[in-house]
Structures are given as structure tokens and as C-alpha cells.
């Protein structure tokens, strides 16, 4: 069995790595790749346990990050969506020489709510965990619906996410469980202060998983970082407001 994760590279220019979220795979970036490959060499990986990397498995955030770094470009702009944002942030904190700039999309240094911090209610995460053990494809479908909820194009977004997921092998249930545990337990809030590279945080105003209050709180904690809020988007702004999303990434990653 190969120990290498599934990577694809498109276009030419500065290196840009895209990391997908929980339950998904690299196919979610297809439209983004098509728009950005004229300006960047875009690298897309299926995280351990997902898509064409389904036979691989990382036990925790540190191991997942190490597996991703193994075949990643020497130095790149890293963009992580949702759970992928935690992976990208972990890499930026622990291997800063590999990360020229960091972009997080609909992501949070701590996904679980814990007053006064806003986030996903722990009971929602534990419900997903118990559902996962019974029927993981239904659980992923529910998670997709939750991600798109609130967006004016919710139905279209869910359809697009679903097509992407179904176009590659099903995720490995063990890795799905690890991912939910990461979302429930990881807290990088205090660590963020030590980030050295430029950072852009992108949010959807209507996001039910990463409440917009997270953006405000982090702006105060990280005044040297940039942020942008997509007014019509929920958890997947790269689909809902695709052109504006690509413009934000382009402007930040190129300057």
C-alpha cells in the first residue's frame, strides 16, 4: 500500500495548496481550481481517510498535518476550508518555513462552542458522532445540508458538494470519527498569536457552523490579520460567491 496521499497540481505560478473540510474531498475545489490555475500552481490533496486517500488514516491533527506536509510543495500559500483550516493553521504554527501565507475559509481555531466563545453546540457534534456509527453516508448528507443552510443558493450548493463527494471513493468512517473529535476538542485560540506569516480569514455571514461573532473576536485578538465576510454565503463561500471568493484569494496571495 502506498503511503502517499492523493495530490493533483494544476496551472503555473506561485504554489497554492487547497485543503478540504470534514466528510468532503479535493473534488470540492474543481471550480476554484479552474478559476485560479491561470495565476497559481494549485495543489489539491485528499486528506487522509477521504476520497482517493481513503485507505490512509491519521490518528489526530498532528499526524494528519505531517502526512499532508510529506508531499506538499516546499513553500506555499496554504488555504484551508473548515476542518482543513485547522490543518493549515496547525502546519503554519508547526512548520512556518513551509507557509508563506495562510488563508482560512469558514474556519475557527475552536469549532465547539464554550461560553462566551461561539461555535457548534457540543450536543450537535456528539449527535453527529453517534449517527456516524449507524449510517455515515446519511450523516455526511446532513452535514452538507447544515453547511449550506441559510445561503440563498443552498440547494445548488448542497448538490455541488454532493456531486464532489460522490465522484471519489467514500471516506473512511474511522477518519470521519477522528475529524469530528478534532472539531470537538481542538483549541488553537491562544496559539494563533504566535503566527508569523500574513493571514487572511474568510467567513460567510450566514454560516451556522462558524458564527460571524468568531470573526469579530479574532479581529480583536489578531489585529495584524486581514478578514473578509461574504454577505450572501453560509459555510461554503467558494461555491456561493465564487467570483468574489477567487478575487479575495488572488489579491491576498499575489501581493
From Swiss-Prot:
- All disulfide bonds of the chain are none
Tell me the enzyme class.
hydrolase
Biological process per Gene Ontology, one example term: biotin biosynthetic process
Q: What is this protein called?
A: Pimeloyl-[acyl-carrier protein] methyl ester esterase
Stored InterPro entries = AB_hydrolase_1, AB_hydrolase_fold, AB_hydrolase_sf, BioH
Specify whether Hydrolase is a keyword of the entry. yes
Tell me the GO molecular function terms: pimelyl-[acyl-carrier protein] methyl ester esterase activity
Could you name the Gene Ontology cellular component terms for this entry?
cytoplasm; membrane
Primary role: The physiological role of BioH is to remove the methyl group introduced by BioC when the pimeloyl moiety is complete. It allows to synthesize pimeloyl-ACP via the fatty acid synthetic pathway through the hydrolysis of the ester bonds of pimeloyl-ACP esters.
Domain (AB hydrolase-1) ranges: 16-241
Enzyme nomenclature, EC number: 3.1.1.85
On assembly, the entry states: Monomer.
Query: What organism is the protein native to?
Result: Vibrio parahaemolyticus serotype O3:K6 (strain RIMD 2210633)
Q: Which reaction does it catalyse?
A: 6-carboxyhexanoyl-[ACP] methyl ester + H2O = 6-carboxyhexanoyl-[ACP] + methanol + H(+)
Task: Detail which positions bind substrate.
Answer: 22, 82-83, 143-147, 235
Query: According to the lineage, what is the superkingdom?
Result: Bacteria
Amino acid at each position: 500500500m502506498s503511503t502517499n496521499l492523493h495530490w493533483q497540481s494544476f496551472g503555473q505560478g506561485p504554489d497554492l495548496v487547497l485543503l478540504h473540510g470534514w466528510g468532503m474531498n479535493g473534488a470540492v475545489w474543481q471550480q476554484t481550481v479552474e478559476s485560479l490555475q491561470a495565476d497559481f500552481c494549485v495543489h489539491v490533496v485528499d486528506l487522509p481517510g477521504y476520497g482517493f486517500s481513503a485507505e490512509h488514516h491519521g490518528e489526530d491533527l498532528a499526524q494528519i498535518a505531517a502526512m499532508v506536509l510529506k508531499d506538499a510543495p516546499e513553500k506555499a500559500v496554504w488555504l484551508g476550508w473548515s476542518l482543513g483550516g485547522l490543518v493549515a493553521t496547525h502546519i503554519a504554527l508547526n512548520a512556518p518555513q513551509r507557509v508563506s501565507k495562510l488563508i482560512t475559509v469558514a474556519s475557527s481555531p475552536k469549532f465547539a462552542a464554550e461560553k462566551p466563545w461561539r461555535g457548534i453546540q457540543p450536543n450537535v457534534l456528539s449527535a453527529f458522532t453517534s449517527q456516524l456509527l449507524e449510517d455515515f453516508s446519511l450523516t455526511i448528507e446532513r452535514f452538507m445540508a447544515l453547511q449550506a443552510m441559510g445561503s440563498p443558493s443552498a440547494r445548488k450548493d448542497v448538490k455541488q458538494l454532493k456531486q464532489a463527494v460522490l465522484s471519489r471513493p467514500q471516506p473512511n468512517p474511522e477518519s470521519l470519527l477522528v475529524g469530528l473529535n478534532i472539531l470537538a476538542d481542538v483549541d488553537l485560540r491562544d496559539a494563533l498569536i504566535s503566527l508569523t506569516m500574513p493571514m487572511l480569514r474568510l467567513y460567510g455571514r450566514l454560516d451556522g457552523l462558524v458564527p460571524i461573532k468568531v470573526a469579530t473576536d479574532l479581529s480583536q485578538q489578531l489585529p495584524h490579520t486581514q478578514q473578509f465576510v461574504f454577505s450572501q454565503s453560509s459555510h461554503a463561500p467558494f461555491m456561493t460567491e465564487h467570483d468574489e471568493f477567487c478575487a479575495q484569494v488572488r489579491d491576498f496571495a499575489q501581493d
